[in-house]
Regions:
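Alpha-helix boundary/N-cap detector
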Residues: 3-10, 31-34, 233, 248, ...
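Positively charged, Gly/Ser-enriched RNA/tRNA-binding surfaces
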Residues: 76-91, 102-105, 135-147, 151, ...
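Acidic, His- and aromatic-enriched active-site or binding-groove loops in soluble protein domains
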Residues: 116-126, 230-258, 345-349
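Glycine-rich, mobile lid/loop segments that gate access to catalytic sites or pores
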Residues: 213-224, 229
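TRNA-binding/sensing appendages of the translation machinery
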Residues: 43-137, 145, 173, 188, ...
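Auxiliary tRNA-acceptor-end handling modules of aminoacyl-tRNA synthetases
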Residues: 2-3, 9-76, 122, 231, ...
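Surface-exposed polar/charged interaction patches
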Residues: 22-25, 42-49, 227, 244-248, ...
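Proline- and acidic/polar-enriched loop/turn elements at helix boundaries
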Residues: 34, 100-101, 215, 237, ...
Length: 556
């Protein structure tokens, strides 16, 4: 008897979810991909033979660019959130929350070329709404709407983008961001430097390995465009093209500027003299300040003065060595007005682009060089459902931000009120990309992640009744200790040990008739430096168990 169409459809959906999971964890999915192709062929053949249509069948899978988070993944994200929240609170921040969808007009015109990635919702009751693209614009709307002049806030929440997803690199359509922003007036670069200090604290505390913070200033970049002769209406589109220099060689970026965006070739060549410059902040700053033509542009001169102050403060904060002054960093979002930055992890560059030399120094840029887009060989294991070879895509920036002084005033002005400027600066950490790095390390055995936070498993031996285990667990729960036990009335010892081992629970409380009669239990350490030498466990008086466990758990 042939497999039913519905069964085949269920198998395909299950395989699609399995392939997603394997790709996220950097495992080979070629076997599952081939199996899914065979099932799809079988499904087509079934329909040709007069089998039922699949149009009315339910496809059990998550939408493209989204994932279910299993216990281990959810717990790892919780760890990331907790680490970041602790740092934000240390810097005097309060948290807020905003709706996941905003009025469409609130988001319109804030994201430049990325506006096409906004999810628009169907009309509901006469209001046109869109899912939020980031947490920054809703924050500015919140500040303007409530007449706030000064606030330090952090916000952890989901955002949505109609991007081409690359699951293994944390590039999703639904993902978490963790934002820290300071709104309010300050002397030049005081808040900017603190936000960069917060960013470095966050990435160091997450222990994800080496990273670099690329930094630039919108006024310097706009000054370069002015010096080169870029028409005002082309400033943002050309800025967006420059921002691609971390992914494409100069020849390709120049082609986009001249062929696609209509920029004069001589103007593009002039831009090319500057955008290849990057390195330690003070060195690049000195080089730019010695450029008389650039210093003759007031906008650029002001930006360079800001950077001089910023680097001085970053040295005080002990994070200057993490910065790279990179003239190719542009950030495509329209609302930035001052410094801009992106944090790049050591694993960010995809293998195929690591072989392309970085953009050369200004004096040696060959603007006539041919395009050198890397070739990639696609395989079933690395090519996703959109035909993107995931092995050629890097993790990308793991955090980004900058100064945006006009956004709050823009909202206030749009309501007809007096446009009060509330200067703002902030940073956003991309949780999914940080998670993908930590998940890679976990798969390599560098990071251990559990699916539960249970601290003690109550194990009964020798026919100890369920009520005794319940009573003991209740005592631990009342003391705030995370505890579990077998739900069976008469569980077998091997099954109980297996449950404790499978969940990697660090301590087991062994309840046995002899010890209970003496008013004691045995506490055995399962995970940790003392576990190997703790074969039988330590006998502890029942009235002292809570204090003993809290001391072991570091909560004494």
């Amino acid at each position: 008897m042939s497999t039913s169409t519905a069964t085949i459809q269920d198998q395909i959906a299950a395989l699609q979810n399995r392939i997603k999971e394997l790709k996220v964890s950097k495992q080979d999915a070629s076997k599952e991909v081939e199996e899914m192709k065979a099932l799809k062929d079988q499904l087509k053949a079934s329909q040709k033979d007069g089998g039922p249509s699949t149009s009315n069948l339910l496809s059990l899978k998550t939408p493209k660019g989204t994932l279910d988070h299993k216990p281990e993944a959810a717990l790892l994200r919780k760890k990331i959130f907790s680490t970041l929240e602790g740092i934000f609170l240390k810097h005097d921040a309060s948290t807020i929350d905003t709706p996941v969808f905003e009025l469409k007009e609130i988001l319109a015109g804030k994201y430049g070329e990325d506006s096409k990635l906004i999810y628009d919702l169907a009309d509901q009751g006469g209001e046109l709404c869109s899912l939020r693209y980031d947490l920054t614009v809703p924050f500015a709307r919140y500040v303007a709407m409530n007449g706030i002049s000064s606030i330090r806030r952090y916000h952890i929440g989901k955002v949505y983008r109609r991007d081409q997803p690359v699951m293994t690199k944390g590039r999703m359509r639904e993902f978490y961001q963790c934002d820290f922003d300071i709104a309010g007036p300050c002397d030049p670069m005081v808040y900017d430097s603190e936000v960069l200090r917060v960013l470095c604290e966050a990435l160091t505390s997450l222990d994800i390995g080496e990273y670099t913070v690329k930094i630039n200033h919108r006024k310097i970049l706009d000054g370069i465009f002015q010096l080169a002769g870029v028409p005002a209406e082309k400033t943002r589109p050309i800025s967006s093209a420059v921002d691609k220099l971390d992914k494409l060689p100069w020849a390709d970026v120049k082609k986009e500027m001249t062929v696609e965006k209509g920029l004069d070739e001589a103007v593009a060549d002039k831009i090319g003299e500057y955008v290849g410059l990057k390195g330690p902040g003070p060195e690049v700053l000195q080089k730019l300040q010695s450029d008389e033509a650039l210093m003759g542009i007031p906008l650029a001169k002001q930006g360079l003065a800001d950077m001089e102050i910023l680097f001085r403060y970053l040295k005080v904060y002990n994070v200057l060595d993490k910065m790279s002054f990179d003239m190719s960093l542009a950030r495509g979002l329209d609302y930035y007005t001052g410094i801009i930055y992106e944090a790049i992890h050591e694993s960010s560059a995809p293998p195929s682009l690591k072989t392309i030399p970085s953009v050369p120094a200004p004096s040696s840029i060959n603007t006539d060089a041919p395009s050198s887009k890397p070739k990639s060989s696609k395989s079933a294991a690395t090519t996703n459902e959109d035909g993107i070879d995931e092995s050629t895509v890097g993790v990308g920036s793991i955090a980004a931000g900058g100064r945006y002084d006009n956004l709050v005033g823009m909202f206030a002005e749009a309501t007809g009120r007096k446009a009060e400027q509330v200067p703002c600066v902030g940073v956003s950490v991309g949780v999914e990309r940080v998670y993908s790095i930590m998940e890679m390390r976990r798969r390599k055995g560098e990071e251990k992640v559990r699916g539960k936070e249970t601290e003690v498993f109550v194990l009964g031996l020798g026919g100890v009744e369920l009520e005794k285990r319940m009573e003991f667990a209740t005592m631990l729960w009342d003391a705030g200790i995370k505890t579990s036990f077998s739900p069976k009335v008469n569980p077998k010892a091997p099954a109980q040990w297996k449950q404790a081992d499978d969940d990697a629970i660090p301590y087991v409380a062994i309840l046995a008739p002899k010890e209970l009669a003496a008013g004691t239990v045995r506490i055995k350490e399962q995970v940790g430096k003392d576990a190997a030498g703790d074969a039988k466990g330590e006998e502890v008086k029942i009235e002292e168990v809570v204090a003993y466990l809290k001391q072991k758990l570091g909560r004494a």
